C-alpha cells in the first residue's frame, strides 16, 4: 500500500488547493463547534451554503436536533458522534469549497449501505460541478463511476 505519491491533473504538477479536496479514512474533527468544523475558518461562506451542505450530506435534521444547532461544541454535545456523522461533517466541509476534484481514500466504507448509496449517487451526479476520484478496493463503486482503473 503506497504511503505517498503525486497528484497530476491535466499534466499540471501542482494543483491549487482550492480546486481539489481529499478525505481519507482518518475520520477526525477538531475541538470546537460543528459550524467551525464545517466552515474551517472560511468566514466568507454564507449561511445558506452551510445549510445546503447539511442537506446534501443528510445532516440537517441531526444537527438541528442539537440544543445549540451549529453552535454545539463537538466535545460538549454530551454524546460521541458516530463515524457516519463525522464522515458527513467532513464531506460537508469539503463540498463547501465547490472544488473541481474530490478525492476519497477508503472513507465510504464507514457509511450505512442506504446512506452510502444515496451519498454516492449525489456525489457522482452529472449535475454536480466536480469530478470524483475514489481510492478503494470496493467493487460496489463500479456502477457509480464512469471509469475504473485497477492497479496491478
Language model: regions and residue ranges:
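Conserved post-Walker A segment of ABC ATPase nucleotide-binding domains
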Residues: 1-55, 117-118, 124-128
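A short, proline-enriched helix->beta-strand linker immediately N-terminal to the Walker B motif
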Residues: 96-100, 129
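Catalytic Walker B motif of ABC-type/P-loop ATPase nucleotide-binding domains
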Residues: 102-106
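ABC ATPase nucleotide-binding domain "signature" loop
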Residues: 109-111
Amino acid at each position: 500500500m503506497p504511503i505517498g505519491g503525486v497528484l497530476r491533473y491535466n499534466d499540471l504538477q501542482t494543483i491549487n488547493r482550492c480546486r481539489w479536496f481529499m478525505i481519507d479514512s482518518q475520520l477526525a474533527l477538531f475541538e470546537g463547534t460543528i459550524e467551525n468544523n464545517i466552515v474551517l475558518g472560511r468566514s466568507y461562506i454564507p449561511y445558506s451554503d452551510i445549510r445546503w451542505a447539511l442537506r446534501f450530506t443528510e445532516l440537517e435534521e441531526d444537527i438541528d436536533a442539537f440544543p445549540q444547532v451549529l453552535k454545539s461544541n463537538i466535545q460538549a454535545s454530551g454524546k460521541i458522534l458516530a463515524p457516519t456523522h463525522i464522515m458527513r461533517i467532513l464531506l460537508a466541509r469539503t463540498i463547501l469549497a465547490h472544488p473541481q476534484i474530490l478525492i476519497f481514500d477508503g472513507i465510504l466504507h464507514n457509511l450505512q449501505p442506504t446512506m452510502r448509496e444515496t451519498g454516492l449517487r449525489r456525489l457522482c451526479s452529472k449535475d454536480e460541478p466536480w469530478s470524483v476520484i475514489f481510492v478503494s478496493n470496493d467493487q460496489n463503486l463500479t456502477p457509480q463511476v464512469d471509469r475504473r482503473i485497477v492497479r496491478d
